[in-house]
Amino acid sequence: LGSRQSGRNPFGNMPHSLPLIFGDTVAAAQVFDRHLGMEVQRIVLVGTFGDEVEEALKVSQALRDKLRGIRIDTPSERGGVTPAMVDELRARMDQMNFRHVEIYISGGLTPDRIKEFQDLDCPVNGYLVGSYISGASPNDFTADIREIEDKAIAKRGRIPGKLDGPRLDRI
């Protein structure tokens, strides 16, 4: 639904459990690839069993042009994802002619961690944030309908019609 509403192709992001079940990252990536529709862009998690860069190169060789990106999610027990790791991955991927493969990082990301990567101009294409968002303080809000097809309407107790909300986007 999100991809249809935004007019973008969907992408699939491989979970940690898949390589664990198949016992091999490349085998898991191939199964992941085989069961996704061709319109779904593939992002494969690496580093479950071995070196992130080495696994990324093996996955890239296996999926070639069908691979949109690599996701690195190195646990904090191993130092987490570092800018040096991302720089090495990009350089090695470029050397092997996988310039089209994007790099995504995840794992304990906070605004400060993301800023660190940005300030160093690290070649990260996207950040997948989970626990920082899910652990955030509640933000009470309502998603009231105030207008339908240019007709002002609202539930009892609310003022119908458009709001002058500069931070609101029409969907």
Show the residue positions of the predicted features.
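Buried, small/hydrophobic-residue-enriched core segments of structured protein domains
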Residues: L1-M96, P111-E116, I148
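Gly/Ser/Thr/Ala-enriched C-terminal appendages of enzymes
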Residues: A62, E77-I171
